[in-house]
Design a protein with these regions (language model features):
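Short, structured loop/turn "capping" segments at alpha-beta junctions
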Residues: 154-156
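Thiamine diphosphate
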Residues: 1-145, 149-152, 160-293
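Generic beta-sheet signal
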Residues: 72, 100, 135, 158, ...
C-alpha cells in the first residue's frame, strides 16, 4: 500500500495536468516526487527551498492571482513556523489555499522534536474559516484532497504514515452503536479505538474531518452523557467543539490524544503512541475508567 504522502504527490501531479488553476508550492520536502510535474508545469510547481514563511506568502499571492495554491511540507514547518504568514497572508487577506502536511504528531520520531507537531490543529483553531481533514487511509486522503482542490476556502489536510488497515468513508460515520457512551475516533486512530472498545457497550463515531466538527451526527447518535474524543494530535483539541455541539445537554467529556508533556527520547512512532496512551490497551484502560467513574 502506498503512503498518504505518496498518494498526495501522485494525485496532485495528475491534477496539475487537468486543472490550470492548481499550483503547488514546496519547501524542498517531497520535491523529488513532483519533478516530472515540475518539468511539465514549471510556472505552477514552485520549490522555494527551506523558506517556510515565503512558502505561505507565495501561496497567498498565487491565490490573489486567481490560482488554487497547494502548499506542502512537514506539519511543524507548515503550520507552526510560518503561523504569522498564515494569519496575515491567508486569513487576513481572506484568500483560499490548501495546506497539506506530512509528519503529523510523531511520524518522524527519529527527527526529534523539531519534526513533531501535535499542536497544529489547535493552533489553526485560533483562526476562523479553516476546514481540517485528518484522513485515516490513503484512499480517504485522495478523496479529501480532491475535494479540497475543488473548494474555494482554506483547507488543512494532515497526512500521516499511521493508517487504518482498511479505508473508511471519507466523512463522519457510525462504526458501532452502544448505550454506555460515545467514542469519537479521528483519522488513523480508528483501528486502535475499535480494538480498544471491542468488549465495551459504546457507540464509535469515525471522522476524518474535524473542522467543521461532526456536531449533528454526535447529537443524533448520543445515547449517554459520556463522550470520549480520541485524536492523533494534542489531547483535548476538540473538547470546545464538542461542548458547543452538546450545549444544553448534561455531558461529560474526556479528551485523549498526544499529551503536552515533553518526551526526550527518540524511539519509534509506536513507542510514542504507547507513551501517549493511544495504543489499544491504554485506550481500553482510559475509556473504561472514565465510563465507570
Amino acid at each position: 500500500m502506498d503512503t498518504m504522502r505518496e498518494r498526495f504527490a501522485a494525485v496532485t501531479s495528475r491534477l496539475l495536468d487537468e486543472d490550470p488553476r492548481l499550483a503547488v508550492v514546496l519547501a524542498v520536502i517531497t520535491s523529488d516526487s513532483f519533478a516530472d510535474a515540475g518539468r511539465r508545469h514549471p510556472d505552477r510547481v514552485i520549490d522555494l527551498g527551506i523558506r517556510e514563511q515565503l512558502l505561505i506568502s507565495t501561496a497567498g499571492g498565487l491565490a490573489l492571482a486567481g490560482l488554487r495554491p497547494v502548499a506542502h511540507t512537514f506539519a511543524s514547518f507548515l503550520v507552526e513556523r510560518p503561523f504569522e504568514q498564515i494569519k496575515l497572508d491567508l486569513n487576513h487577506l481572506d484568500v483560499g489555499a490548501v495546506l497539506v502536511s506530512a509528519g503529523a504528531s510523531y511520524d518522524m520520531s527519529a527527527g526529534g522534536r523539531t519534526h513533531q507537531s501535535p499542536g497544529d490543529v489547535a493552533l489553526l483553531d485560533t483562526l476562523p474559516g479553516w476546514t481540517v481533514h485528518v484522513p485515516g487511509h490513503p484512499d480517504e486522503a485522495e478523496t479529501l484532497l480532491r475535494e479540497a482542490y475543488q473548494a474555494e476556502g482554506r483547507v488543512y489536510v494532515r497526512l500521516s504514515t499511521e493508517t487504518n488497515e482498511q479505508p473508511l468513508p471519507a466523512k463522519p460515520t457510525v462504526l458501532k452503536r452502544g448505550r454506555r457512551g460515545t467514542v469519537v475516533a479521528v483519522g488513523p486512530l480508528a483501528d486502535p479505538v475499535l480494538a480498544a472498545t471491542s468488549d465495551l457497550d459504546v457507540t464509535v463515531l469515525y471522522t476524518p474531518t474535524v473542522r467543521p466538527f461532526p456536531a449533528q451526527l454526535l447529537r443524533e447518535t448520543l445515547a449517554a452523557p459520556e463522550v470520549i474524543l480520541v485524536e492523533p494530535y494534542l489531547a483535548g483539541t476538540s473538547i470546545p467543539a464538542t461542548a458547543r455541539a452538546l450545549s444544553g445537554q448534561p455531558t461529560r467529556i474526556l479528551g485523549l490524544g498526544v499529551a503536552s508533556k515533553e518526551l526526550r527520547h527518540y524511539g519509534t512512532p509506536g513507542d510514542h503512541q504507547k507513551a501517549h496512551g493511544l495504543d489499544p490497551s491504554s485506550l481500553h484502560r482510559s475509556i473504561t475508567a472514565f465510563l465507570t467513574a
